[in-house]
Amino acid sequence: MARKRREPETAAIVSVTHDGRGIADVTGKKVFVAGALEGETVRFQRRKRRRNFDEAELLEVLDASPSRIEPRCAVFGTCGGCSLQHVSDADQRAIKARALADNLERIGKVTPANWLDPIHATDGWPYRRRARLAVKDVPAKGRVLVGFRESHAPYVCDMQRCEVLAKPIDGLIDPLSDL
């Protein structure tokens, strides 16, 4: 017997995780929607069902958050190297600071008396100085792929450059593919 196909659903995103997944509360169950932001109304399709939560794919943003921006990278969404490029720099820092505070309180049982402002680059780009890149010879493409793994897949993302990597590292991706 064939599995029943689930219909797309609509929900309001009430919070966001450290890795850029929006959290919706649908009939008492948490649903993590990849790429959705706090304050947005989205249409999504559930992909993985668990006992306490579900994971979903974003189909459409019906009411966008003011934090949402156009990602700089052409392979954002496919590439697993970063998950918050669709969020403004200031809001990315706020999401990460909130995740740190939540983890310290929930896991470490520590509540700092005061917080220092995060240290960040002037414009926030590029911000990554280290990376673990995958390398795979793909005869069908006629070259070696060098890059991050695709999000939710074991494949190497076909990329020539990376917007978040510091320039000395970013400049090595394409030459390494030619080896």
Spans of model-derived segments:
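Accessory RNA-recognition modules of RNA-modification enzymes
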Residues: 1-179
